[in-house]
Amino acid sequence: MNYQVGTPGRIVVARFNDGDDILGGLEEIARRENLRAAAFHLVGAMKGGRYVVGPEREEIPPVPVWRQLAESHEAVGFGTIFWEGDRPKVHYHGAFGKRDQVKVGCLREASEAFLVLEAVITEIVGVTARRELDEASGMVLLTLENKESP
């Protein structure tokens, strides 16, 4: 385990309107505001998105199991933003509910708001976290320096 300690910085509140690209919008905010490290919460509704519900098997590199949101769902979740090279990279896990069904996963593509979706983004000041390609997994993962656990 590696870790760093930061402090809360600026807080950004955003509203996504019907049809807005959620992942793209979060990246745009991070780029415009130069948020190099942040955590965010989302609450509202979505009508589209491709998300991953885990690997097919517990092996490395993992083969993702993809699912699709194809209609409106209530949505709530948490995520982080750290940069990969010269661009912000969002990592978001959420729950998506409709009627008596709830789906949970990592939203990765084609994210589309329904009616309204709210975001509260908290900047993390004083950390040097970033995302880098992990050769073994083939995934872009969080990288931290210093403070290894005993």
What are these regions (language model features)?
Residues M1-V90, A95-P150:
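N-terminal intrinsically disordered, cationic/polar leader segments
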